[in-house]
């Protein structure tokens, strides 16, 4: 991945909620904290040569690195806070703080580390970044992309409601089912599906709780989805947004990411539905790129992803929703793009998988079973077949991140 200087990465999933709260002392929910803990070494696989990753569990991380074949081992350092504070700025030069997603709390953590002596440059938080992270920005981008692609069938732009009454008005005048979303959420979180035009008591309580916390919720028709995909980009912060790759991924019914396909970019594009195998794909990529240049290009610097989907229309024909979600952060799709480029053999097809196990010990047993079932085989310095873990798996782990190539 392109960078202008060496970086210090930090994996902080679920940062959207932290952006919404806007407090430097924000504490993520338990699931986000556990995911950040178990998958803290994931930046190894998208960081540039010479970068570093700020981690907590150095012993397990060192053992994990030692377990990788030398030809596959990233030229990236895994450093705990004390080791970072011992680095010399004169020798090392400053490292640019680069979290998975920018938010006030993670930047405050980097700043505390800098004050302890770590030679790092910490970006300044801007309220403009909060505005861009709000789902209203994605809604505005959707409108602009639709204007640039008049050949697409119209899709409903999300409506933002500030009261239960406004939600009721929407559902009683439109056709069910519906998707309700909180303004700072992603990957299936903060989403409620309304299957009918009448709102149940539990659904009303969910809406009331979301409104108390966030002030608004968005609502839109739920589409008959047949495929998920995303386009990944990089913004230089000076008005230039460039295409970084295609992600074809899978989700739980509620929308949470479960896995992304890996392989040669042309072969991945060939896995898209027929509607995207012609000129529409390139027109879509151009329209979204131009929209992002206008919207985020001079405010945000870094990688980002735009989630999209293919859906079935009432007449049975396929159509594209060109802008479901804007992710101003590194994404699992970007991780998949880099794994396809760096790790997976060009003749192989695989999947990046994120799995959550119910209890400590389950993840380690699953990892051991997968390693026996799919032993790794390498060719030309790349993974040709097998199951490769991307993070250490310990008896305490709940989350796993791994590649399967079969």
State what each model feature region is.
Residues 214, 243, 255-318, 356-383:
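A long amphipathic alpha-helix within ATP-dependent nucleotide-binding catalytic cores
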Residues 203-258, 309-312, 316-323:
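Phosphate-binding site of ATP-dependent enzymes
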Residues 2-52:
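N-terminal-proximal low-complexity accessory segments that begin disordered
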Residues 252, 323-337:
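Glycine-rich phosphate/pyrophosphate-binding beta-alpha loops
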């Amino acid at each position: 991945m392109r960078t202008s200087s060496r970086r210090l990465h930090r994996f902080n999933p679920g940062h959207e909620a932290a952006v919404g709260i806007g407090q430097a002392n924000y504490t993520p929910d338990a699931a986000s904290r556990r995911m950040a803990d178990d998958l803290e070494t994931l930046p190894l696989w998208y960081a540039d040569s010479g970068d570093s990753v700020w981690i907590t569990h150095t012993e397990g991380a060192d053992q994990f690195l030692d377990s990788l074949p030398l030809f596959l081992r990233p030229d990236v350092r895994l450093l705990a806070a004390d080791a970072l504070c011992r680095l010399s700025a004169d020798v090392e030069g400053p490292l640019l703080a680069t979290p998975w997603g920018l938010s006030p709390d993670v930047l405050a953590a980097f700043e505390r580390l800098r004050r302890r002596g770590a030679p790092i440059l910490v970006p300044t938080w801007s309220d403009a970044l909060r505005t861009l992270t709000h789902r209203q920005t994605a809604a505005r981008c959707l409108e602009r992309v639709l204007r640039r692609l008049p050949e697409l069938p119209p899709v409903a732009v999300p409506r933002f409601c500030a009261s239960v009454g406004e939600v009721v008005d929407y559902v009683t005048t439109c056709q069910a089912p519906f998707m309700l979303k909180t303004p700072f959420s992603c990957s299936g979180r903060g989403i409620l599906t309304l299957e009918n035009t009448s709102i149940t008591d539990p659904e009303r309580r969910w809406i009331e709780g979301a409104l108390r916390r966030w002030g608004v919720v968005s609502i839109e028709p739920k589409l008959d989805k047949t495929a998920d995909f995303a386009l990944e980009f990089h913004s230089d912060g000076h008005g230039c947004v460039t295409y970084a790759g295609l992600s074809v991924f899978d989700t739980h019914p509620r929308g949470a990411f479960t896995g992304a396909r890996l392989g040669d970019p042309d072969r991945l594009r060939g896995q898209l539905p027929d509607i995207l195998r012609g000129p529409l794909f390139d027109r879509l990529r151009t329209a979204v790129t131009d929209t992002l240049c206008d919207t985020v290009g001079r405010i945000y610097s870094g990688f980002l992803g735009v989630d999209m989907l293919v859906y079935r229309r009432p007449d049975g024909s396929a159509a594209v929703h060109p802008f479901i979600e804007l992710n101003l952060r590194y994404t699992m799709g970007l991780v998949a793009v880099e794994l396809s480029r760096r790790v997976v053999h060009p003749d192989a097809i695989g999947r990046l998988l994120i799995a959550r196990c119910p209890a400590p010990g389950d993840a380690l047993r699953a990892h051991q079973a997968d390693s026996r079932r799919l032993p790794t085989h390498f060719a030309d310095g790349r993974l040709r077949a097998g199951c490769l873990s991307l993070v250490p798996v310990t008896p305490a782990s709940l989350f796993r991140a791994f590649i399967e190539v079969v």
